[in-house]
């Protein structure tokens, strides 16, 4: 599929083989949706450590599928929550940005 903006199936294929791309994207999609739900809950409950850990995990997973913009957003959130004890306005903004970027990525994965 040409014209993909938010992820790179070629990168996934290079790592796991062309025949496994759909399975990997399916797993990533599920993980991302779960992470977004957990981020939302952690934000509401002021669970900074949970936000930090999810960000770290999803940064790596997003890079694996070539979702570099989203990986960068997760990395920013990971760094921003390092040594924080309470959620800040910046944390909320970062999570909002991640939600927006994730929607675009998920739409593209669904169309793939």
How would you name each of these model-derived features?
Residues 1-53, 57-112:
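Two-component system phosphorelay core
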């Amino acid at each position: 599929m040409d014209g993909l903006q938010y992820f790179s199936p070629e990168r996934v294929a290079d790592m796991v083989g062309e025949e496994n791309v759909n399975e990997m994207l399916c797993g990533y999609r599920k993980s991302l949706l779960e992470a977004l739900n957990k981020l939302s809950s952690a934000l509401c409950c002021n669970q900074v450590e949970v936000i930090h850990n999810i960000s770290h995990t999803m940064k790596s997973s997003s890079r694996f599928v070539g979702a570099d913009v989203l990986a960068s957003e997760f990395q920013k959130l990971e760094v921003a929550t390092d040594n924080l004890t309470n959620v800040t306005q910046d944390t909320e903004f970062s999570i909002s940005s991640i939600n927006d970027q994730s929607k675009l990525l998920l739409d593209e994965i669904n169309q793939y």
